[in-house]
Amino acid sequence: MLDPRARTLLKTLIERYIADGQPVGSRTLSRYSGLELSPATIRNVMSDLEELGLVSSPHTSAGRVPTPRGYRLFVDTMLTVETPIDAAAVARQVQSTLQAGEPQQKVVAAAASVLSNLSQFAGVVLTPRRSHVFKQIEFMRLSEKRILLIIVTPEGDVQNRMLATPRDYSPSQLTEASNYINAHFAGLSFDEVRRRLRDEIDQLRGDMTALMHAAVTASTEVPDTEDTVLISGERNLLEVADLSSDMARLRKLFDVFDQKTGLLQLLDVSSHAQGVQIFIGGESTLVPIEEMSVVTAPYEVNGKIVGTLGVIGPTRMAYNRVIPIVDITARLLSLTLSQQ
């Protein structure tokens, strides 16, 4: 537990390091902390903070820099998100980018782009998982014995399947089959539809039953779409010296983007929590680079969490600026998708 004096000095040190990117010495702390302390007293406090693992001393400087543990204490207990940016302006920019009525994938990709543009780092979005449940289906005759099955999920996602049938069906027969399925089975999983069709087979004409079974089989034969991670603005991170000045670190950074497995795991963890979360490199095992942090928030469709979005940037980022960008974008993406 830090005393108020140590907390003030640590907070000042981290704020100055975020602003300037240079190790912070006792003279700078004296100037910006608002505390009337001698340089010797400040150095003693810094030594205590170093022993606690909250700051460290680069070999080339007399000043100190925050450690991952110091950043964690800062964002958890000292950070005041006073939104130095214009929150209303951010909301307007996000809203102008996220257009209701656009295909879901396009809206989600736009969210990654707006996160990158506003933060000047990389924006990332875990796209919604495809639903095992359908809201509506439709059959469309393409040619003799070839039918297009159109599936609409509760999230508004549209999936298409091609059906090859042993016989031809008229448009009226296809309408009859889709109306029956929509009236009796909408909101159920296709496994449940298959089970119920088996129970109701005596009530249906044989040719309709065959078509419905073909539709259910086609819907479940295709493997579930893998969770997709969309990234925008990776090149922005080339301008961040903390991440790009070392070639090995830069290679590791782009391995993160190429592999996406670690990002997928991190975003999945975030989707099980409410509100904004901050993952700090060197402190979180989910972030493989000590100089990198990820700020995330889940987003919803009709009150149900379906994915996560966030900003990838340096550990030395202005958290009080990035957090509201992520929070506002998540809220407005949720609103846009729920209006689909």
Curated annotation (Swiss-Prot):
GO terms, molecular function: DNA binding
Keywords: Repressor, Stress response, Transcription, Transcription regulation
Family recorded in the similarity comment: Belongs to the HrcA family.
InterPro entries, per the entry: GAF-like_dom_sf (IPR029016), HrcA (IPR002571), HrcA_C (IPR021153), WH-like_DNA-bd_sf (IPR036388), WH_DNA-bd_sf (IPR036390), WHTH_HrcA_DNA-bd (IPR005104), WHTH_transcript_rep_HrcA_IDD (IPR023120)
UniProt-listed Pfam families: HrcA, HrcA_DNA-bdg
Name listed for the protein in its UniProt record: Heat-inducible transcription repressor HrcA
PANTHER family: HEAT-INDUCIBLE TRANSCRIPTION REPRESSOR HRCA (PTHR34824:SF1)
Biological process annotations from GO: negative regulation of DNA-templated transcription
Domain of life: Bacteria
Known role: Negative regulator of class I heat shock genes (grpE-dnaK-dnaJ and groELS operons). Prevents heat-shock induction of these operons.
